[in-house]
Amino acid sequence: MAPPIEVSTKSYVEKHVSLPTLNERILSSMSHRSVAAHPWHDLEIGPEAPIIFNCVVEIGKGSKVKYELDKTTGLIKVDRILYSSVVYPHNYGFIPRTLCEDSDPIDVLVIMQEPVIPGCFLRAKAIGLMPMIDQGEKDDKIIAVCADDPEYRHYNDISELPPHRMAEIRRFFEDYKKNENKEVAVNDFLPATAAYDAVQHSMDLYADYVVENLRR
């Protein structure tokens, strides 16, 4: 078992996270289903969210294949092969039991030493937010580190990363759709507190979504 991670943001959780979360209470009533587990809806986000949370990996570091979650089946499908001569610089996926305005779970890029297979999940720690506009629509990304990687778990804010690492991430997202004639704009990276707020907001949107569906 990995040694405990010291996070200096305990006060943030106490102020912004009510336990038990609405997500957990509502979804527990939906657990008596004879269907396969769905990584978006059935995997818990984790008790330390929005700082440390579970992340489902869709795309492994170094991959040119754009995998994504099939929201109907819960399986990971091949969406396309990237048109540009680039590969994902880090593992990429989503945070379960979250929801954004585009009706998808919130995206997260996880910095760690090794690539991992699509469909697995890991514990990630938010260190920053990358505001992004994809074809005119908001598509922000949480930047995180693997909470169980001894090389990266001590990072608490994106400002602690080497400047080259941040430039690498920015350049990938600016370029990876250029050969599809799709415009992507990446704004300045925001600190860890902005990432916590974004994750918490997506958790709240998901909880509201579940409530509305239970009322139908």
From Swiss-Prot:
Annotated positions binding substrate: K66, R80, Y92, Y176
Annotated EC: 3.6.1.1
Tissue expression profile of the protein: Ubiquitous, excepted in pollen. Very low expression in cork, xylem and hypocotyls.
Protein name: Soluble inorganic pyrophosphatase 4
Compartment(s) where it occurs, according to its Swiss-Prot or TrEMBL record: Cytoplasm
Assembly behavior: Monomer.
Domain of life: Eukaryota
Spans through the membrane: none
Molecular functions (GO terms): inorganic diphosphate phosphatase activity; magnesium ion binding
Class of this enzyme: hydrolase
Known function: Catalyzes the irreversible hydrolysis of pyrophosphate (PPi) to phosphate. The MgPPi(2-) complex binds to the enzyme only after a free Mg(2+) ion has bound. No activity with glycerol-3-phosphate, glucose-6-phosphate, p-nitrophenylphosphate, ADP, NADP(+), NAD(+),NADH, NADPH or phosphoribosyl pyrophosphate as substrates.
PTM sites of type Phosphoserine: S18
Catalyzed chemical reaction(s): diphosphate + H2O = 2 phosphate + H(+)
InterPro entries linked: Pyrophosphatase, Pyrophosphatase_sf
PROSITE patterns per UniProt: PPASE (PS00387)
PANTHER family: INORGANIC PYROPHOSPHATASE (PTHR10286)
Homology family: Belongs to the PPase family.
Necessary cofactors: Mg(2+)
Keyword terms, alphabetized: Cytoplasm, Hydrolase, Magnesium, Metal-binding, Phosphoprotein
A Gene Ontology biological process term: phosphate-containing compound metabolic process
